[in-house]
Amino acid sequence: MLNNSRLCIIWLFGLISGFNLMITGNTLNYWLAKEDIALQTIGILSFITLPYSINFLLAPIFDAVQIKYLNKIFGHRLSWICLTSSALIFLIYIFSFLDPSTNLLLFAFTALIISFFSAAQDTILSALRTEIVPKESLGFTSGIYIFGYRVGMLLAGSGAIYLSIYLTFNEIYKIFAGLVFIYLILLIVGIKYCDLNENIHIQIIKNDIKNNQNKKNIINFIYNALKPIGSVYFIILILIFLVLYRLPDNLINVMINPFLLHLEYDAFEIASVGKFCGVVGAIIGGLVGGVIMKHKNILNSIFLFGIIHALGHILFIFLEINGKNSLLLFITIGIASITGGMTMTAYIAFISALCQGKFRATQYSFLSSMMGISRSIFPIISGYMVVNFGWQNFFLFTTIITIPSLLILLKIKTKLQ
């Protein structure tokens, strides 16, 4: 049974991950849309979050390599957290002086580097979370983690857009740099207070990597790390499912800011209804999903939540047909966010449940990287889809594309039984 202090730490992990993601994700996307950057370009720039797709390549390093001096002071995981946080603080502050309308290439490159360190930190936090949470508590703690994740998104998303009424985005990103510093202090204090004993576990992993001659390169290491999960065919099925299940949301997320600006909503309406209510709904959905999964197994939950969430996407079509309508926007965002929070909770719990053995960090990072591929690579075409087929067909596609992922899930369920 987890005590309250550890639950708070798990919540803080989620908050930091959600906050960091928004810095180079939706908030950056809104900044670009406000600068009237072309839809096709905005879609292409979703690649900025690409490091989240390949962070599993870094997981073996975080598992095995110690930062000599910091490790003595903070311990293995926390020393890596300190290093990545320091890099983020510096880079975000530098980024706050750039302008996408005058030098888009430098702007995008710097954002990509920030995304790299954000993804690296996300990998470390996820590994630490899987180490301190018993398997039987994964469903409930996933809800706590997603709660924190959504609060982080709220701060860096809705909060930033609301502040853009009064401040420039350059000023807002300076504030972001300061908040990342505060989060680092909270993490150091929280982890030290909880006295998380990770060093024995890490030393076992380090020795195993060093002594096992089959793990001479990264590919062999990942292959051996994934063996406890199942056969190659089974893992491929899981990877395809993980990409497709999150694809509808990720396509919409890249285009939601241009869509709301297209309907002529202002910054306050987008921040309050489009973002704040959306994040609150996602938090509620995450908590509801966590509670449901305490009484219903993860596979059945993720299937049910996926169907409900897909139907919610149809409301965006009605919003496009009706035009600017605050009540309909509230209903659409509310339903999409609550059901989205439920699916995300089940999704994280599903990945966590698959991880087993000594190399959970590598397993979790590799599997969760599929969420990154779904978020970074495929949405590149979203702008072209809207320009060539229109908003209504775009949202119809996001509803239909859910079906293949659910069919694959049924196949996975059969394999597990």
Curated annotation (Swiss-Prot):
GO terms for molecular function: transmembrane transporter activity. Gene3D superfamilies: MFS general substrate transporter like domains (1.20.1250.20). It is a multi-pass membrane protein. One of its GO terms (cellular component) is plasma membrane. It is found in: Cell inner membrane. Pfam families: MFS_1. The chain crosses the membrane at residues 7-27, 42-62, 78-98, 104-124, 143-163, 171-191, 225-245, 273-293, 301-321, 328-348, 366-386, 389-409. It comes from the Bacteria. Keywords: Cell inner membrane, Cell membrane, Membrane, Transmembrane, Transmembrane helix, Transport. InterPro entries: AmpG_permease/AT-1, MFS, MFS_dom, MFS_trans_sf. Belongs to the major facilitator superfamily. This is Putative transporter AmpG 1.
